[in-house]
């Protein structure tokens, strides 16, 4: 076998491979003999059919199969010999494959980029310095009360904190538009669900009032046909309601699975959950900054084949989120996923290089700690831990998580790390 390597554009490579004719002919002959020996032919005893007849009937098909197998096998031998690491499946193209002549073919493919980590010391990470305070717990309790609240109709004007039921019809230049009409629409005043100016126009109005308001859709509104458009809404207030918060008593506490200890026990449980969420949020914020810095300091070429694979993964995930229609999801335009897919590939390649450069191995104690921490969010943590320990696939997933965390720790160890005091709400409400 003769092999030459061509470097094409970017990460693309081409192997030109020559396989001696004897190798092909020997393989074809062996397969034809196998057919002659094991298949039945009318008029002949098994294994007694003439080879010329077998070759005439099956020779062309067998040769095609053998050529495919030979190209695949010799491609693998060639990349091992040349120490090449393909990033995707090759495209084979026969150049010369006449019977009796050497097989000459090429294989075109992409390789993984050569990554030499740099700039880890330039990465800046601002670690949130934050704790759950009593006021945060009280605010969360109030949020729980609001979630359990009931609404009672009142003869009062609409204002922040009240809820109104309205009919409305929207129009632009005198023409109604799609999605601009509703009846008995519940709107909590002050929640900021509607476009700017909509709630302001309702404030102060009472049951039975009919009126019109003028608003302008934001330039970044999700509906393309409404961006920046001036609109008029005809509105009728059907009723105004006030929120009735539940009392902080044993009945309220019981709704959250706290059987004993009253409101103090609920507060303790709420604090524990908030501290667990806070710990994860701090970890995520640090990880996000470390990865952002890693990507910024290390620009690399990305194999298109890996991006295509990741796009398909994202499409399948989209299908799972939206009803499981994989076929429909696979038809979604690649542009929807391309940027995210490329980012994920880049991050994966760079973290892989961090793991390699620092010779990181999975820390099984860290794996156990991650599972134990995660299990605390469930009613029976011991059962969750046991479930993971008995499921090898789940354990392997957790090992990957642990190894990624070890890679992040290695980045942080070389980065410029500072602390910044923030409140619980500031951290938890930061945009992703």
Curated annotation (Swiss-Prot):
Q: Which InterPro entries would you find in this protein's record? A: PPIase_dom_sf, PPIase_FKBP_dom, Trig_fac, Trigger_fac_C, Trigger_fac_C_sf, Trigger_fac_ribosome-bd_bac, Trigger_fac_ribosome-bd_sf, Trigger_fact/SurA_dom_sf
Q: One of this protein's GO BP terms?
A: protein unfolding
Which reaction does this enzyme catalyse, per its entry? [protein]-peptidylproline (omega=180) = [protein]-peptidylproline (omega=0)
Q: Per the database record, which ranges form the PPIase FKBP-type domain?
A: 161-246
Instruction: Output the Gene Ontology terms for molecular function.
Output: peptidyl-prolyl cis-trans isomerase activity; protein folding chaperone; ribosome binding
Q: Provide the alphabetized UniProt keywords.
A: Cell cycle, Cell division, Chaperone, Cytoplasm, Isomerase, Rotamase
Question: Where in the cell?
Answer: Cytoplasm
Offer one Pfam family short name for this entry. Answer: FKBP_C
> What family is it from?
Belongs to the FKBP-type PPIase family. Tig subfamily.
- NCBIfam families in the record, alphabetically? tig
Swiss-Prot/TrEMBL domain comment: Consists of 3 domains; the N-terminus binds the ribosome, the middle domain has PPIase activity, while the C-terminus has intrinsic chaperone activity on its own.
Under what name is this protein listed? Trigger factor
The organism named in the record is Vibrio vulnificus (strain YJ016)
